[in-house]
Amino acid sequence: MSDITSLTLTELVKNIKDKKISSEETTKAFIDRGEKSRDLNTYITEDFSNALLKAKSFDQKPNFDLKLPGVPIAVKDLFCTKDVKTTAGSKILNNFIPPYESTVTQNIWNEGAILLGKLNCDEFAMGSSNETSFFGNVQSPIDKGLVPGGSSGGSASALAANLTPITIGTDTGGSIRQPASFTGTVGLKPTYGSCSRYGIVAFASSLDQAGPMSKDVKDCALLQEIISTYDEKDSTSIDFKRNEYSKELTNNIKGKKIGIPKEYRVDGMPKEIEDLWTKGIEYAKDCGAEIVEISLPHTNYALPTYYIVAPAEASSNLARYDGVKYGFRSKGENLIDMYEKTRSEGFGSEVQRRIMIGTYVLSSGYYDAYYLKAQKVRKLIKNDFDEAYKKVDAILTPSTPSAAFKIGEKTNDPVSMYLNDIFTVPVNLAGLPAISIPAGIDVKGYPLGLQIIGKAFDEQNILNIAYAMEEKIQFKNKITDWWIK
């Protein structure tokens, strides 16, 4: 096997099942590449020695009926992993070792996968560039000095750099789709309630959703099949008939109606994004789809709505971090002083900003003017999508308003950073599924993605559309391994 790490998940599983490669051989290959790639800063915690032991154990008693037989995988450090440090990219959780496993990761281990380690992310998933992490920013494998996107930046970087064959992220306002777009990979944000939130460090509970990130759509479908289960431990988990997404995957989308929302043609959109969208429409037509112009009139208000609702929920969720039961604790002269010092020293500046925004909009004098109004607008945004889906089967948009930007370019301009999520946040507010697929490059050769948005619980449909378009686009990620000396 020339280069195990460059294989897709589907290829890797086939080779392991055909006994062409062992789990130990596979795991060693990913560990070796991981050790050579530390300059990317993708890992917060490496669990390489345990991974090798588990791989050897699997090879001694293999079970090839499993969907991920002995496959090594690294996951975002927002998922609780029993007895393995889970930090959420924050100083305040730097010493936290969970006594339990998240449902999503448990589903993955149940299918035979092996944990390689925990991947870097923006602190508490608050960020669009992986620059807010206490453990330092992540480099994109696309080019030196480039952000990989966020908050699942470590996941996207590790995937594109072939440090893991697949991975999982979380998406609150675009945190799977935006980094996937920036790194030339595939990222699916499932319907809210499709994947359990149990054991995921919470940011905004009505928006957070776990999802798969992969090298191609087929791998994405397989991982979604594994992680999407009903869970009684999560009150927002929804019990519905789930598809066998990978088995039901088809490139036949003839006659599907795909909507193009006129409101997404925003002022100042770069020509390369306009051109990408136009090409995407042509690809969809070539696949046999019918293009329909639609209107989503209230999505213009999605960004301000999101940046009221999400910080409000974050300020409530993060109130639990006080230094008493677990995590970082600062010394204080009394209890109140200890609380103040722990939180001011333990949280980074972006997290503090969002806590303050959230506390403000929930305060008695401003609750009606901001939070309540935002929830009403959120309902209108959901209604816009409901109306659109009376005419179309899916919606096609760009994933992001630009290609990846340089590290440090937007750190002093929060509004500019927040605008990165302009095409992704409406989906979270409406609780819908959406997938980003690589579809082209800009003038510098940086990847650009297209987003396909579906009806609630219609992941199969958007996976099929993505699969058909992927075949037409024939995107090839150009990674030069610039970071390996």
Swiss-Prot record:
EC number: 6.3.5.7
Cell inner membrane found in the keyword field: no
Enzymatic class: ligase
Active site: 76 (charge relay system), 151 (charge relay system), 175 (acyl-ester intermediate)
One BP annotation, GO: translation
Pfam families documented for this protein: Amidase (PF01425)
Record field: catalytic activity: L-glutamyl-tRNA(Gln) + L-glutamine + ATP + H2O = L-glutaminyl-tRNA(Gln) + L-glutamate + ADP + phosphate + H(+)
Keyword field contains Nucleotide-binding: yes
InterPro entries associated with the record: Amidase, Amidase_CS, Amidase_dom, AS_sf, GatA
One example GO MF annotation: ATP binding
Keywords, sorted A to Z: ATP-binding, Ligase, Nucleotide-binding, Protein biosynthesis
GO cellular component: glutamyl-tRNA(Gln) amidotransferase complex
Subunit description: Heterotrimer of A, B and C subunits.
Family: Belongs to the amidase family. GatA subfamily.
HAMAP family per the UniProt record, alphabetical: GatA
Record's function text: Allows the formation of correctly charged Gln-tRNA(Gln) through the transamidation of misacylated Glu-tRNA(Gln) in organisms which lack glutaminyl-tRNA synthetase. The reaction takes place in the presence of glutamine and ATP through an activated gamma-phospho-Glu-tRNA(Gln).
NCBIfam families referenced in this protein's UniProt entry, alphabetically: gatA (TIGR00132)
Protein name: Glutamyl-tRNA(Gln) amidotransferase subunit A
Originating species: Pelagibacter ubique (strain HTCC1062)
Species classification: Bacteria, Pseudomonadati, Pseudomonadota, Alphaproteobacteria, Candidatus Pelagibacterales
